[in-house]
Design a protein with these regions (language model features):
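Tandem repeat scaffolds
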Residues: 156, 164-286
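Hydrophobic scaffolds flanking metal-cofactor catalytic centers in soluble metalloenzymes
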Residues: 1-119, 123-142, 147-150, 154-165
Length: 287
């Protein structure tokens, strides 16, 4: 469930739309190739995406759906076979959703505490994998929302097992909480339920997030400097890429430290904090 851009037909650069914003320098409609996409399906500005106004591209991750659709579902590129382009671009986000579920299920199966439900997790993984191998027409007929709901039941049970063994405040429930800009520096968030929480711009420097459930948490611009996320569950590369961190940030072994994170150590940590939804005064934006 890892992206292999060398075996993809540049699907994220073509199939998906984006609007001119802080994340993208230009607007692009779905189905129209990004002007930076080369003939060999590589990005012409990959090494300088962030400096060129495309940080959104460095955040995105397809969970390996790109190469699956390119090499398995179709086998020929949208350039070589233009008649398949529209369908290929429709299939891509479907497979991407399914591959995200495979990522979660694979992680859940790797955890010793989920041994009591391993058989159910394995069955769900195999069913999801079977769906990804379908023909284009079959994939477009998949009820992704219904399948996600079914898988989510197992992910919730996984979360409960992990958080119960985290050794912290496992009862801390911040599911879907508005923690935008929250001051959580040094906070003990071990075993916390942060599913779908809005942590945009939150100060999580030095926070202990071991055993926390972070599925769907919005970490855009959150400061993870010195934070400990080892043992957290359902954290994805997309979330990590969207956050800020440093050399002292501890990540789960399955995730990669983003290249745009500084390689410097943080200063002395502040005293442990408590969860607070008090937001800092807004700063005046430049430009």
């Amino acid at each position: 469930m890892r992206a292999d851009c060398a075996n993809c037909f540049g699907l994220c650069c073509v199939a998906l739309p984006f609007a001119a914003s802080a994340d993208f320098a230009i607007s692009k409609d779905a189905g129209r190739p990004c002007p930076n996409l080369r003939d060999d399906f590589r990005c012409g500005i990959h090494a300088r995406l962030r400096d060129s106004g495309f940080p959104g591209c460095t955040v995105y991750d397809c969970f390996g759906a790109g190469q699956k659709v390119s090499q398995v579902t179709f086998g020929r590129s949208w350039r070589d076979d233009p008649a398949t382009a529209a369908q290929m671009f429709e299939v891509f986000p479907v497979v991407r959703h399914l591959h995200e579920l495979l990522w979660y299920l694979d992680e859940a199966m790797s955890l010793p505490v989920t041994r009591p439900i391993h058989a159910e997790l394995r069955a769900a993984f195999e069913e999801t994998e079977r769906l990804t191998m379908g023909a284009p027409g079959d994939l477009l007929g998949v009820d992704v929302a219904a399948h996600r709901d079914k898988v989510n039941t197992l992910l919730l049970r996984t979360s409960e097992l992990v958080r119960a063994s985290a050794g912290g405040r496992a009862s801390a429930d911040h599911r879907g909480a508005d923690l935008i800009g929250a001051r959580l520096r040094g906070a003990d968030l071990r075993g916390a339920n942060l599913r779908g929480a809005y942590l945009i711009g939150a100060d999580l420097r030095g926070a202990d997030l071991r055993g926390a459930d972070l599925i769907g948490a919005d970490l855009r611009g959150a400061d993870l400097g010195g934070a400990d996320l080892t043992g957290s569950v359902f954290l994805t590369q997309v979330q990590v890429n969207a956050a800020r961190g440093d050399a002292a940030t501890k990540l789960p072994p399955a995730l990669t430290r983003p290249a745009h994170w500084p390689a410097t150590q943080p200063g002395p940590a502040a005293a442990p904090g408590r969860v607070s939804t008090r937001r800092p005064r807004p700063r005046r934006r430049r430009g």
